[in-house]
Amino acid sequence: MEDIEHLILGAGPAGLRVAQVLAQAGCEVLVLEKHAEIGPKTCAGGLTGKTMRELTPLGLPADATLASIGHVAFAGGRQVVLDAELTLVHTIARRDLGRYQLQWARGAGATVRAGVPASDIDLGERTVRADGRRIRWRHLIGADGADSAVRRALGLPSPRTYFAAEYNVPGLRLEPLRIECDPGAIANGYFWVFPHQAYTSVGAVAPKRVVAPATLRRYLDGRCEGLGVTREDVPFEGATLEVAYHGCHFPGGVHLAGDAAGVISSLTAEGIYAALVTGEEVARTILEPRAPAPKTTSWLRTKRWHDRLSRWLARPATRDRTFGLFASVAETRWLRRPLASWLLNG
């Protein structure tokens, strides 16, 4: 039996941020990642301004990302820039983001083991099986993504109601960076083109109960063909998203952060920012139970509004009218910045 003060399952943005904060405070931290490589995940890899304000002070180099001004099109309307400042998006490969965060966490003193899945979580005994032995924890942090084993062990529902699909096409610089709402085909989901330094992510996201994953893939394939994007030798990537939030702190020293906690916006599908801030503030609450969590609180307030609008847009009777309203707002100069702020600034 191995005893660990803080055991983190999952080495994504949330888990590595938890690890970094706890290790910097002098705590014993072990992170277990089931995948052999840390970082890769189905994700457009977009960092909004608020996300960059989290990562830059941590040491993310200025040349690690590609900066692009984002465009948006509502309901078949033309592509517009809502606000050049607020819609500036930095793109980074998740492999690269994981590499930087791994460096920061290990530099702070955390132990991170990749290729080590965990099983047999026993919340009563505070133990888990990993690497052929039992590990006992004082605090268990589930940062293990949408299909979280820790979330399941807590008995929380895990509907994972959204599905994202993408192709990461190497050597392609397809511009501009854009999001296109296409309510006739993918309901309240959207299509994206996110150029990176070495590739372009072309993808789409939608609720599974309205647009089946197989239908979303066919839609994405059709959009790629329309853009002249070859998919030869480019693997299709798909993943479910958890947007149902039930809390971050639970009895018995168990905590959830990031996708495992369901903090993704069901409107924008933005998840990296929420993973970083919940990871940081879960760690700070472990260190000081009465510590405030202002960034998490603010984000959850934004998420609630996003989720309400997303549910509204899921209704066929109101979808077209609402997207039409957004298209009108996007054509009204003095309304563009407030809309961009609400969607992206949180």
State each model region's role.
Residues 7, 20-43:
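Glycine-rich FAD pyrophosphate-binding loop
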Residues 12-13, 37, 145:
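Residue-level detector of alpha-helix initiation sites
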Residues 309-346:
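C-terminal auxiliary extensions adjacent to catalytic cores
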Residues 104-230, 246, 262:
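Predominantly flavin-linked oxidoreductase catalytic cores and closely associated redox partners
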Residues 49-100:
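A conserved beta-strand/loop capping segment in the N-terminal third of enzymes
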Residues 1-14:
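Beta1/beta-strand and adjacent pyrophosphate-binding region of the FAD-binding site
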Residues 246, 284-321:
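Active-site-proximal substrate-binding core of FAD-dependent oxidoreductases
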